[in-house]
């Protein structure tokens, strides 16, 4: 069972992670339909997921990991990482289990995290990246106003081939335009 809600969206709530969430995180990251989209070629163990959870729960980290939940059940994870408070910038990432994909949860969850970053963390810039062939992730970022800033050719090695990466950025002033 996830921790209490931290941010509430229209379709998903973003809950704090607790130790018991490590199994969901490992299972989700290893799912055959999720894993190819993540920058990792080997299994993600429950032990590694526990370390991730400890990092999310730590007071020493400026980063943040939250479970995206629908009716209290976890359907994915959104995170803010590489936070540089002095420079006002961070990166975000997200993944969702297959049965939750295509329902708008990603747009709602990532949008809530972006709003939190700009409103409460006083960030000026949020970056993100997606595989060049990940149309769903790219559409989510673009729908939220992220601007394509670069392309890294043959950045990932996935399923016996190299695939590019698209990098995105969103400035606080661009977020406020809406």
Residue ranges and their predicted role:
Residues 33-55:
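Conserved GNAT-fold acetyl-CoA-binding loop/helix
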Residues 53-67, 74-76:
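A short helix-loop-beta-strand connector motif used in the catalytic cores of GNAT acetyltransferases and
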Residues 41-42, 65, 157:
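Sparse recognition of residues in long alpha-helices and their boundaries
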Residues 1-23, 27-32, 68-178:
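Acyl-donor (CoA/ACP) binding surface of acyl/acetyltransferases
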């Amino acid at each position: 069972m996830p921790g209490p809600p931290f941010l509430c969206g229209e379709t998903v709530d973003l809950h704090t992670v607790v130790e018991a969430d490590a199994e969901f995180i490992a299972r989700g990251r290893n799912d055959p339909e999720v894993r190819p989209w993540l920058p990792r070629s080997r299994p993600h163990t429950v032990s590694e997921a526990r370390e991730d959870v400890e990092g999310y729960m730590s007071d020493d980290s400026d980063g943040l990991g939250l479970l995206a939940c629908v009716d209290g059940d976890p359907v994915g994870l959104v995170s803010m990482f590489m936070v540089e408070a002095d420079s006002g910038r961070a990166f975000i990432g997200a993944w969702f289990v297959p049965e939750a994909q295509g329902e708008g949860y990603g747009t709602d969850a990532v949008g809530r995290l972006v709003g939190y970053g700009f409103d409460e963390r006083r960030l000026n810039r949020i970056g993100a990246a997606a595989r060049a062939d990940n149309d769903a992730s790219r559409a989510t970022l673009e729908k939220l106003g992220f601007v394509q800033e670069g392309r890294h050719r043959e950045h990932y090695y996935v399923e016996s081939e190299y695939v590019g990466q698209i990098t995105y950025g969103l400035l606080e002033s661009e977020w406020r335009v809406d």
